[in-house]
């Protein structure tokens, strides 16, 4: 039987030593879980695809009923942000916990259960936002409620933000708050979305804490050629040239490159994976075997594959206006997610070589986010250590630092010196390919994950902000 590593023993000791406010012993967790499920379902039942006002009103009403002061800040009255603060003794800088209240849009016809019903079925809660991001939102709101009810003693203020506009319009949410109201949310550390607990077969295997993320770059491909009559097909057809260019770029395997975070991630992931997967992750570091490993990941684990390089996804194609007219121009919009240290001009030049067609122009897009990408967050900080210990205590699992392949609103805070860590509820690894993941037409979260996520947040927040006696 293998002996626990020194780090595992240290984490276990820290987990056992996490501060527990005296009043926390009085929490009736079965009763709290019932309340938590009601609040979680209520949040999912609010349509916040175009306006977060309904969520803001619910959160404000719920917190104020507990005696927690609430402030609404809005660039647009239909897109309010909620801010609440519980005061500590001031011996340490504040902790910020934030989640976004908006969701992506829906096509109701594609849902088995109505997207805003929060239907409980087969041990899952179904609905838009059930994962992204109302799982974090409810857990943070309930943590604030429990801190207030138990009169928890805090070494630092705990600031809660329910932000608007994360799904593509952060100018109404964190972009606005960071630019116009930063003193009201300034903190030493922040807990937000971006991570997850990974379950397989219903069993939690490991936790991922997002410590860095790719940044959006974007580009367009524009193909041009003579217009003409559709009855006389030409070799210069703009759509044909665009189609070839899109195929070449979509199936290209860009250069793989590790950073400290992804190297640690794959090394640790190999220790908690089944033998076949573990060998595949190890093969990524072997120049003679990495191509086969990458090919497997591209086919079967696109999210994992995307962590290896700057990725390109053709998502919009536009061209033509009439069936019998050869168009003179056709355009493809590319979603590019770049490694934090990617040299984009050089990468665009590589793309041009792959496309290899003078009829197709690559037009770089404007960088998304705020400023230059920042280095990875510390994995030796007290905050990160408490997160590791909390995952160990609640789930009995190890923690892997990870680089997100998508951007979050933490990009608005990290350049300002806030140490931001991305978290998430436990999700089934099998769900993504089955169409049950975030942004899917059957988005869902296991009921047990709802309860465990609240338990984790309670441990983490009291561990980071709780007073040491």
Language model: regions and residue ranges:
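Sec/Tat signal peptide C-region and signal peptidase I cleavage site
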Residues: 20-24
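Bacterial N-terminal signal peptides that target proteins for export
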Residues: 1-10
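Bacterial N-terminal signal peptides
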Residues: 10-19
């Amino acid at each position: 039987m293998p002996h626990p590593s020194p780090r595992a023993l240290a984490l276990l000791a820290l987990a056992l030593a996490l501060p527990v406010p005296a009043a926390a012993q009085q929490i009736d967790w079965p009763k709290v879980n019932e309340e938590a499920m009601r609040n979680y379902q209520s949040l999912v039942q609010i349509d916040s695809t175009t306006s977060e006002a309904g969520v803001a009103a619910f959160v404000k009403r719920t917190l104020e009923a507990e005696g927690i002061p609430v402030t609404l800040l809005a660039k647009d009255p239909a897109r309010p942000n909620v801010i609440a603060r519980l005061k500590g003794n001031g011996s340490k800088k504040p902790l910020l916990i934030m989640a976004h209240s908006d969701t992506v849009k829906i096509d109701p016809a594609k849902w088995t259960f109505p997207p805003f019903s929060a239907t409980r079925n087969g041990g899952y809660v179904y609905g838009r936002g059930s994962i992204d991001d109302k799982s974090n939102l409810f857990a943070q709101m309930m943590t604030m409620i429990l801190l207030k009810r138990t009169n928890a003693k805090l070494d630092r203020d705990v600031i809660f933000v329910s932000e608007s506009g994360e799904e593509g319009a952060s100018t109404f949410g964190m972009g606005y708050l960071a630019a116009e109201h930063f003193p009201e949310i300034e903190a030493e550390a922040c807990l937000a979305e971006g991570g997850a607990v990974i379950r397989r077969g219903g069993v939690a295997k490991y936790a991922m804490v997002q410590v860095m993320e790719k940044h959006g770059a974007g580009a367009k491909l524009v193909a041009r050629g003579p217009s003409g009559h559709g009855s006389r097909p030409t070799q210069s057809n703009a759509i044909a040239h665009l189609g070839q260019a899109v195929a070449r770029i979509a199936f290209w395997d860009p250069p793989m490159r590790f950073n400290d975070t992804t190297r640690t991630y794959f090394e640790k992931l190999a220790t908690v994976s089944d033998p076949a997967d573990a060998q595949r992750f190890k093969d990524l570091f072997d120049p003679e075997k990495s191509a086969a490993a990458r090919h497997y990941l591209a086919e079967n684990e696109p999210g994992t594959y995307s962590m290896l390089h700057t990725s390109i996804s053709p998502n919009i194609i536009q061209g033509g206006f009439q069936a019998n007219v050869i168009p003179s121009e056709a355009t493809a919009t590319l979603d590019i997610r770049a490694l934090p240290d990617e040299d984009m001009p050089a990468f665009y030049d590589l793309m041009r070589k792959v496309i290899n067609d003078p009829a197709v122009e690559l037009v770089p897009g404007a960088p998304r986010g705020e400023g230059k990408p920042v280095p990875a967050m510390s994995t030796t900080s007290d905050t990160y250590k408490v997160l590791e210990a909390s995952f160990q205590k609640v789930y009995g699992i190890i923690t892997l630092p990870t680089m997100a392949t998508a951007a979050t609103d933490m990009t608005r805070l990290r350049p300002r010196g806030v140490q931001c860590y991305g978290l998430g509820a436990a999700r089934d690894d099998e769900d993504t390919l089955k169409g049950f993941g975030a942004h899917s037409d059957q988005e869902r979260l296991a009921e047990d994950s709802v309860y465990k996520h609240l338990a984790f947040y309670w441990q983490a927040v009291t561990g980071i902000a709780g007073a040491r006696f």
